[in-house]
Amino acid sequence: MSLRNRLFQLTLVVLSLAIGMQAQDTQHCSNATLHGSYGFHATGTGFVAVGRFVFDGNGGLTGKLFIRVPGTNIGPLEFTGTYSVSPDCTVTDNWLDSTHVSVIVDQGKGYFIMNVSPSTAAADTLNNGEGRRQ
């Protein structure tokens, strides 16, 4: 095989990979991307929580959480809230008087979440959380 043919084949492979990567980067999300039931866990300093969220695909959510802080079990806490998904697959939600930001992963099969409500260093216990579609 000539050098010219090899370069042509290499160019086709690189071009195909670039197109495939661009297709993955252009995923567009909406409220409908986040729908159904998701198992949830979060950990922090002196804090752990597990629970379940149900997203309706239209910006509404319900949840049930069980929380453990040193020496105390809290819950179940049942609540409702709202969420908004941006085209870049980031999420802002509000529930239990807190605001959170999330990133949808794995084509809507999960998300990573962080509490962004105003707090003090002493009260800031949530480090990270994750939800997975059930």
Where are each of the predicted segments found?
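N-terminal secretory signal peptides that target proteins for export/translocation
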Residues: 1-5
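Bacterial N-terminal signal peptides
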Residues: 9-18
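Mature soluble binding/inhibitory domains
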Residues: 22-134
